[in-house]
Amino acid sequence: VGSEMCIRDSHYVATERAHVHLADGYSDLASKALGYLGQLGGDEAVESFAAARSREIERRYAPIVRDAGSDPRVRAQALADALTQDGYAATVRDIGGGTLAVQLCQGHCPIQNVAGDFPQLCDAETLAFGKLLDVHVQRLSTLAGGGHVCTTHIPVGMPVIRPGARNVRRK
């Protein structure tokens, strides 16, 4: 369900064959290096690397997101535009009638092969997105995990309770 909205509304989504052609020779080396890091320092070393990557993502995109202002939708779009510049083919789509949330969809992932072996990298990216957007985001799918796109759910508003409305529970 999470990626279906993105698939229907995305500008471009790379096919599996395209991902192979877009991949570079560094993926295998990076996976082996992270595997070796894990052998030497255990899971903590890989987690430390992922945390450093999260901080790097925050540093790279913080000025762009900050300059976008305070509107969460505009901030999410600024992040998507910056990610697209870096090869992630990112888009933002309203869900739920455009009132409560958007989805950040990434149609390509330059580190997909490495992240398939080390999902901590996807977790680090998700953490960075939440910090950048200053909301609790939720990753719904990843290319590395077999999804058609990476999809991140971003709440952008709170439900409005109409005056006089009652919260009634039925038993």
Could you tell me what each predicted segment is?
Residues S141-K171:
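Amphipathic alpha-helical interface segments
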Residues S3, A14, R139:
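Short beta-strand "wing" residues that participate in macromolecule-binding interfaces
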Residues R17-L22, I111-N113, G157-G164:
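Short, charged/polar, Gly/Pro-enriched secondary-structure boundary elements
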Residues R8-D43:
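Conserved segment of winged-helix/HTH DNA-binding domains
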Residues Q39, D43-T151:
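Mid-protein regulatory/catalytic core that forms ligand/cofactor-binding pockets
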Residues V13, C105, H153-P155:
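Residue-level recognition of well-ordered beta-strand positions that form the cores
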Residues S27-L29, P119-C122, G164-K171:
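Short intrinsically disordered coil segments
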Residues V1-I7:
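Short, small-residue-biased leader/transition segments that mark boundaries at the very start
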